[in-house]
Amino acid sequence: MRVSASVKKICRNCKIIRRKGVVRVICTDMRHKQRQG
């Protein structure tokens, strides 16, 4: 899980979603998991 100020899609499988006001990136590649905070 990478925590960054701005989350970006890395590949075409990445999806940007909001959970409880937190912006997250979920992907089939676990290295691409990110959250904003």
Curated annotation (Swiss-Prot):
InterPro entries: Ribosomal_bL36 (IPR000473), Ribosomal_bL36_sp (IPR035977). GO terms for cellular component: cytoplasm; ribonucleoprotein complex; ribosome. GO terms for molecular function: structural constituent of ribosome. One of its GO terms (biological process) is translation. The keyword Chloroplast does not apply. Keywords: Ribonucleoprotein, Ribosomal protein. The keyword DNA-binding does not apply. Disulfide bonds: none annotated. HAMAP family: Ribosomal_bL36. Belongs to the bacterial ribosomal protein bL36 family. This is Large ribosomal subunit protein bL36.
